[in-house]
Amino acid sequence: MREIVHLQTGQCRNQIGAKFWEVVSDEHGIEPDGLYKGNNDLQLERISVYYNEVGANKYVPRAVLVDLEPGTMDSVRSGPLGSLFRPDNFVFGQSGGGNNWAKGHYTEGAELVDAVLDVVRKEAEGTDCLQGFQITHSLGGGTGAGMGTLLISKIREEYPDRMMCTYSVVPSPKVSDTVVEPYNATLSVHQLVENSDETFCIDNEALYDICFRTLKLTTPTYGDLNHLISIVMSGITTCLRFPGQLNSDLRKLAVNMVPFPRLHFFMPGVCPLTARGSQQYRAVTVPELTQQMFDAKNMMAASDPRHGRYLTVAAVFRGKVSMKEVEEQMQNVQNKNSAYFVEWIPNNVLTAQCDIPPRGCKMAVTFLGNSTAIQELFKRVNDQFAAMFKRKAFLHWYTQEGMDEMEFTEAESNMQDLVAEYQQYQDATADEEEGEYEEEPAEEEQ
């Protein structure tokens, strides 16, 4: 089967990762002690994508948990799923990344990276046909951003032909826990542009908005935010884990979603949105789902898709839905809002379907959009970066770990290039491109 090895680096990611395993284990009927207690054969049919079977009916996640300090690991271990993970797969340092990208990427993280790669190798060797890796990390911290990107580039070296998929939590202005987030995020994006195949940008600010507006939670906790992220993660991979009429995998997703190699930053969304622990109170229909799915309020990245155009879109429907109805509705959305889809990629909406709905729903959909509006998110980080970098504020923390100012300048210009590329394709039309191509051969003749 097409296995995926999951890595989680840094504090907040380990909490998200733990939540993700909670959701996936629940869907596959696996108890916190790793024993299968489900009642449906479909749960076991492709369980090997995320789990190793170690004994009769006992399953262990293919997860590697990494942090530069032992604190988070202890909380995962003592949490509800503590005994689910393989003890050898916890890799941690003692010093902490201190929210410093340079520590994670060059000094502390570099010392730990070989130990992590050994565990990753062991997991990869235990697979029949490895499909790729997924990494959860935040771009604002030291471990998740610095060490996360270091791991990505090392794994890339060793497994160049495997998919590399990242769930990256982008820092947001309203929900910030450190001053140097813009530095860490810019340095990380610089790495992700080169080394990742698909990056799902998740934004704390957007998640808070969803909790306030849609779920009507007055005081959302990180638990609520992590719950939303884990739903997206489980939604993206359902096609791999369960049978369906139109299956998709990470590579098919990338082929359909990435028109230009650098532009692989997606906005995820999910509907219907329900709070943790609450059931759905009414049935949803396919037209409602498609309507909600494209709603800006459902996006988990804080940029408004109406400010840009969609290059490509993928929608993964779950539950017993009629594919004919889905196709009609998707076509309908495209026809009505054709201005928001680039016309030079016809049929740029991919739909996949999986028969098994998430717990407590009849049907649901996970949305992925490759929209040029995501540049807003990078612009925002870049402006904050520029303001601090102009005065060289906080720079000594990075230079004393051996970094050079040059690296900051490079990362900044790479991010600005990325924004410019998105803008270029947002403005491009089918006609003007043709005109350009027609002129070129004429010049050669002279």
From Swiss-Prot:
CDD domains noted in UniProt: beta_tubulin
An example Pfam family from this entry, by short name, is: Tubulin
Regions of biased composition (Acidic residues) lie at 429-446
**Residue positions binding Mg(2+):** E69
Q: Where is this region: Disordered?
A: 423-446
Q: Which GO terms describe its biological process?
A: microtubule-based process
Q: What is its main location?
A: cytoplasm
Q: Which PROSITE patterns match?
A: TUBULIN (PS00227), TUBULIN_B_AUTOREG (PS00228)
Q: What does this protein do?
A: Tubulin is the major constituent of microtubules, a cylinder consisting of laterally associated linear protofilaments composed of alpha- and beta-tubulin heterodimers. Microtubules grow by the addition of GTP-tubulin dimers to the microtubule end, where a stabilizing cap forms. Below the cap, tubulin dimers are in GDP-bound state, owing to GTPase activity of alpha-tubulin.
> Which family is annotated?
Belongs to the tubulin family.
Give the protein name, as stated in the record.
Tubulin beta chain
Q: What is the lineage of its organism?
A: Eukaryota, Fungi, Dikarya, Basidiomycota, Agaricomycotina
